[in-house]
Amino acid sequence: MVVRRKKKSPKKYRGSRTHGGGSHKNRRGAGNRGGRGMAGSHKHKWFHVIKYMPDHFGKRGFNRPPKVVREPNTINVGELDALADKLLEDGIAEKDGDKIVIDVTDERLKPYGGPFDKVLGGGHVKRPLVVVAPEFTERAVEKLEEAGGEAREA
């Protein structure tokens, strides 16, 4: 058995006029390759499709209508902590002893990007806040409780 010890060098077609394309007339137009791109994929290139792109044709699943898909409006606990004094001034938040109560579902939060559906755990909480919201992340609840506040589900 012959063992090739030296790696075969790739053929660069130096000095060749047509680089393996047959006659110089053959490379003209798209007829030489059976059409451009995906042309003929439902006809003469069908075997290529079923071998290399088996899922290319046909429908699978469905797309939900955009008006049904609703991304939750979120805010970080750090942002609430930073806004707390301003919200107290505007009468959106209330003081309950040493705690500040903020209802993030309040329509009056529109100038601040609200009302919010979910409270996330980003940022630092330096004072006790009682936050009322439909949803919280675990980290948000941890941070609020560490600062002496609480998370209330709306």
Swiss-Prot record:
Gene Ontology CC: cytosolic large ribosomal subunit
One example GO MF annotation: rRNA binding
InterPro entries: Rbsml_uL15_N, Ribosomal_uL15, Ribosomal_uL15/eL18, Ribosomal_uL15/eL18_sf, Ribosomal_uL15_CS
Basic residues composition bias: residue spans: 1-30
Chain residue ranges for the region called Disordered: 1-41
SUPFAM superfamilies linked: Ribosomal proteins L15p and L18e
Keywords: Ribonucleoprotein, Ribosomal protein, RNA-binding, rRNA-binding
Pfam family, one: Ribosomal_L27A
Record-level GO BP terms: translation
Superkingdom of this protein's organism: Archaea
Assembly and oligomerization: Part of the 50S ribosomal subunit.
Function description: Binds to the 23S rRNA.
Family under the similarity heading: Belongs to the universal ribosomal protein uL15 family.
Record protein name field: Large ribosomal subunit protein uL15
Gene field: rpl15
